[in-house]
Amino acid sequence: MTQLYIQDVTLRDGMHAIRHQISPTAVARIASALEAAGVNAIEVAHGDGLAGGSVNYGPGSNTDWEWIEAAADAVTTAKLTTLLLPGIGTVAELKRAYSLGVRSIRVAAHCTEADITAQHITMARELGMDVSGFLMLSHMASAETLAEQAKLMETFGAHCVYVTDSGGRLTMPMVRDRVRAYRDVLDSHTEIGIHAHENLSLSVANSVVAVEEGATRIDASLAGHGAGAGNCPLEAFVAVADLHGWGHSCDLFALQDAADDLVRPLHDRPVRVDRETLTLGYAGVYSSFLRHAEAAAQRYDVDVRSILIEAGRRRLVGGQEDMLVDIALSLST
């Protein structure tokens, strides 16, 4: 039987959906519910990872440390996880997260820049952490190129490497090709993960295809709480996993209750496929650009979709949020 590792991202990717505004009390409540529902791991951080709170990415209502401490106090069995983007988060932040109880780290880079993760992956392994490599915007590299980058992360020490569909742009054949390419080059003991977004309404389908091709770590969030149209909805994926007979440790009804009772009430903007979020996937734009693009569109009185299409044409990547204002200004003149 296929046995899955369910990695919740409600309290990290989900931060984008609420502009990184959530109290430690709410974090603890959600983390406790997730553990009770049986997820293997719970990721906690600013949406852009450790030290992501900034003018460019958006300040958080609290520090990463306050959120992590709240989650650490609330869980005992689920593995506390966080995300780090080299260039934003540093080895110092990694060590501090470890001191607060984080035992799993995902080290993220643009899909063609795995080389910048070596120091952080190596340090995490020295600390004894579970380490995953996170190749963002995986649609922007061919399956072969992506697999080469995944192999680099493996040589640095990653236990798992993800196909990370940050733009919600991958289709099912594209996911299949990328996971197969990973499996062809990675050692048999190295796990493969899938991080899907719902922008094209394919997050569950793409996650299923990934599992069929050998992925075992699945990123998902309560009510799909995440950037853009959201992540793979945890409760929906678990229901499908049950229908496929795949092994996991989750309680479907408990996930449904947590999604509807704890997470949906947090939304100040619906997390769904709509004209703006669909355009993210159609254009292949980083999902976390949504709220930044909407703000720029309102400021300069232009259609947010036009901004997103141009961002896709320019192949903008994470960290270039400021360019959305430049695009909006150009469109308004």
From Swiss-Prot:
Disulfide bonds: none annotated. GO terms for molecular function: 2-isopropylmalate synthase activity; 4-hydroxy-2-oxovalerate aldolase activity; manganese ion binding. CDD domains: DRE_TIM_HOA. InterPro entries: 2-IPM_HCS-like (IPR050073), 4OH_2_O-val_aldolase (IPR017629), Aldolase_TIM (IPR013785), DmpG_comm (IPR012425), DRE_TIM_HOA (IPR035685), PYR_CT (IPR000891). Belongs to the 4-hydroxy-2-oxovalerate aldolase family. PANTHER family: 2-ISOPROPYLMALATE SYNTHASE 1, CHLOROPLASTIC-RELATED, HOMOCITRATE SYNTHASE-RELATED. This is 4-hydroxy-2-oxovalerate aldolase 2. It comes from Mycobacteroides abscessus (strain ATCC 19977 / DSM 44196 / CCUG 20993 / CIP 104536 / JCM 13569 / NCTC 13031 / TMC 1543 / L948) (Mycobacterium abscessus).
